[in-house]
């Protein structure tokens, strides 16, 4: 299995320590729980970044980092039909934050596979930096990543 993470070049060395998610929280974790967010494809990782463009997050200076996950590594998967109604809404976050934070604390697995809110039939992979099996993953060197400018422009009429 492969995972991909897009991040600012200046954070590449610490992209998988979960510190950003610990400090600010995320869809699948409460503030205080360290976790690294990745996607099963580079395309989904791109979309997951683009949904934050309106939040003022700059997209220049990004790098893509590929992660190889051994096939025999236990991965917990959560399917969309296992989630509470409304899980894709912004106000549906509390249940997801609790679910993810409990998984982090349980150390049940190093990887949690969760449906993307953007495309529920595709998956993001949460990596638990405190799990001993994280050492079994292969983290590749960051590669420069540039967003196609057409993704960021207004449609012309």
Predicted regions span which residues?
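Glycine-rich, charged/polar anion/phosphate-binding loops
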Residues: 21-22, 50-52, 97, 112
